């Protein structure tokens, strides 16, 4: 499904991804792990088609994703319909006057008729158990409530792949537990999950495979999540835990 070969990406002169090679198959639940600034968020943006490789190649379902193709509005919409992205800061993707309008925005951009748009909004409100949010202003919601609305917006397009950047950040324990259970259900239903996270307590519940980055912006490990969590020396080496971690 996702094939990344020898990909490098920089912000001006600062390298964010350094010769990345990675394959992700349909239905996998993959965690991207590493210290802040190691390249996790940049890789998620590349997978979602927000940016394209400077060097190397990125293929989705066998088709190479290039800057030129992403400039084509039709191609870009089709890609974003299949790959949903939940940003770390929910405020960056919530900008409409009500939760209903927020969730309806994506389907309308895809050209769906209003009956289908309304059905999708209602289905997503029910799926996320936020039916009472329908007429509320997104700006007035709590952090956890905003995260649920952001996920509902993405789910309204019924993507094959769900990409989440630090989804546990800023959530209280109850909302974290809800999100873990929700993601597990999505994965069991066949959705491919790609999640960046620092949460060592919950990562084994939401992923079966872990990709570990070092501070040189390269991948240093690709193994089962449970195996990685047992390798404390490796986690210390990439500054994901400190010397007092047990």
Which residue ranges define each predicted feature?
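Helix-to-loop junction immediately C-terminal to a conserved catalytic motif
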Residues: 48
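Conserved ABC ATPase "signature" region
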Residues: 115-133
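H-loop/switch region of ABC-family ATPase nucleotide-binding domains
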Residues: 197-198
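The feature captures the beta-strand-to-loop junction immediately N-terminal to the Walker
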Residues: 33-35
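Conserved ABC ATPase signature
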Residues: 137-141, 145
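Catalytic Walker B motif of ABC-type/P-loop ATPase nucleotide-binding domains
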Residues: 162-165
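Conserved beta-strand-loop-alpha-helix hinge in the C-terminal portion
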Residues: 217-239
């Amino acid at each position: 499904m996702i094939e990344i070969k020898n990909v490098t990406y920089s912000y001006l002169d600062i390298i964010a991804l350094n010769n990345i090679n990675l394959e992700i198959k349909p239905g996998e639940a993959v965690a991207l792990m590493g210290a802040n600034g190691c390249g996790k968020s940049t890789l998620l943006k590349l997978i979602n088609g927000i940016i394209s490789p400077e060097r190397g190649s990125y293929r989705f379902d066998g088709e190479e994703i290039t800057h030129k193709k992403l400039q084509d509005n039709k191609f870009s919409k089709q890609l974003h319909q299949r790959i949903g992205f939940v940003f770390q800061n929910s405020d960056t993707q919530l900008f409409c006057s009500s939760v209903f309008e927020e969730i309806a925005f994506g389907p309308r951009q895809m050209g769906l008729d209003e009956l289908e748009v309304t059905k999708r909004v209602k289905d997503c409100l029910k799926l996320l158990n936020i039916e009472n949010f329908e007429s509320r202003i997104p700006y007035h919601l709590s952090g956890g409530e905003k995260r649920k609305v952001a996920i509902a917006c993405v789910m309204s397009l019924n993507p094959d792949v769900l990409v989440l950047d630090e989804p546990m950040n800023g959530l209280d324990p109850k909302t974290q537990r809800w999100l873990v259970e929700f993601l597990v259900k999505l994965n069991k239903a066949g959705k491919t999950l790609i999640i960046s996270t620092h949460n060592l307590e919950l990562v084994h519940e939401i992923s079966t495979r872990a990709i570990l980055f070092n501070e040189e912006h390269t991948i240093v490990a690709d193994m089962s999540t449970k195996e990685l969590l047992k390798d404390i020396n490796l986690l210390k080496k990439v500054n994901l835990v400190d010397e007092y971690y047990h």
